[in-house]
């Protein structure tokens, strides 16, 4: 891992680290969203659907902004706490983030997902559970810092998904995009779309 993958926050304390969602994950999910939704306005026009294609375009843009906002998550670790934050332009009702002082961390518990994966939750002394972000660049470094701050053994904690999984998904997404583009261009050349 290169040192420029994890940004240090010079304006805060010397030891604060910022971990962002991996660019591979961000690009893959944004491309998948565009690829899956791009045909909808064209299909609405061809099938004479009761929903105008303009409304679909508007909904797609709103959805894209919402997805991008969710993918702007940042995990900040400093001497006092772990924090999950979002940029100021993201409304708090949509994604409000959380913070947990290191002194309040009681344990790190594993849970199985519906798909058979493993996720981890911080348990606070008050019984609240906070999801450990697992799709960040520098995950291993982040987990080492969590272990150093809490004393909880994190040697068995691994990322939820590996980069090759997102590379495969990105490859299939690009293939689907090519099929979408071919279908839309063919429909336009046949005069089915205006």
Q: What is the predicted function of each stretch?
A:
Residues 84-144:
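Non-transmembrane, membrane-adjacent beta-strand/coil modules in membrane-associated proteins
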Residues 41, 45, 58, 73, ...:
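Short N-terminal micro-motifs specific to bacterial/archaeal maturation
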Residues 178-194:
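Juxtamembrane boundary at the C-terminal end of a transmembrane helix
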Residues 26-28, 45-60, 194:
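Hydrophobic alpha-helical transmembrane segments
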Residues 1-47, 127-128, 135, 141-148, ...:
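N-terminal membrane-targeting/pre-transmembrane regions
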Residues 2-6, 68-74, 103-107:
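Short small/polar-residue motifs
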Residues 9-11, 74-75, 121-123:
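Short, exposed beta-strand/loop patches in secreted or surface proteins that constitute
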Residues 60-101:
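Conserved beta-hairpin
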């Amino acid at each position: 891992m290169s040192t420029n993958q994890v940004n240090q926050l010079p304006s805060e304390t010397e030891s604060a680290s910022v971990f962002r969602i991996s660019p591979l994950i961000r690009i893959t999910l944004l491309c998948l969203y565009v690829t899956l939704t791009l045909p909808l306005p064209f299909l609405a026009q061809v099938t004479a659907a009761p929903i105008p294609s303009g409304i679909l375009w508007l909904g797609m843009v709103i959805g894209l902004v919402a997805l991008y906002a969710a993918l702007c998550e940042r995990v900040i670790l400093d001497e006092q706490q772990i924090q999950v934050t979002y940029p100021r332009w993201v409304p708090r009702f949509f994604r409000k983030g959380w913070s947990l002082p290191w002194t309040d961390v009681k344990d790190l518990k594993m849970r199985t997902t519906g798909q058979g994966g493993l996720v981890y939750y911080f348990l606070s002394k008050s019984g609240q559970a906070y999801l450990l972000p697992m799709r960040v660049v520098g995950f291993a470094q982040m987990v080492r810092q969590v272990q150093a701050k809490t004393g909880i053994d994190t040697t068995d904690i691994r990322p939820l998904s590996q980069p090759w999984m997102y590379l495969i998904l990105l490859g299939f997404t690009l293939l689907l995009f090519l099929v979408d583009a071919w279908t839309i261009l063919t429909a336009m050349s046949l005069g089915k779309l205006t």
